[in-house]
């Protein structure tokens, strides 16, 4: 990654290592140097890179259907996951909405909160609170409720209150 491809809020002190491959919790760069992956995100921390069981499950699903069509159709995989989630969460959920990641999940929750208060006739309840240095995602809505001022500055005027 070069300075031209870095996000504007990230400042590199030099050339970044170029990762060639990864296994488990380790990254290996093009020169063969190994690193513990401290930046891969929650799924990598829990599962690891190149997890054979996960890769095989993904391949099996992709061979059937690559997209879940959550609002127009259902699939065995969607229904099985819903059953697992209901079981883990005590069986009390009536509705499950699948999203692609954390930013979209936060964005959906913000919209749900706004819709709820509008339906209650509480139109003035449109503000959100966040802890300092909190991070909730990359979308404008998720960024709005993040307490990471350095990441918000460039978008002031476009964010939610």
Question: What is the role of each PLM region?
Answer:
Residues 1-95:
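N-terminal glycine-rich, Lys/His-bearing helix-loop that initiates the first secondary-structure elements
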Residues 83-161:
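PLP-dependent aspartate aminotransferase-fold enzymes
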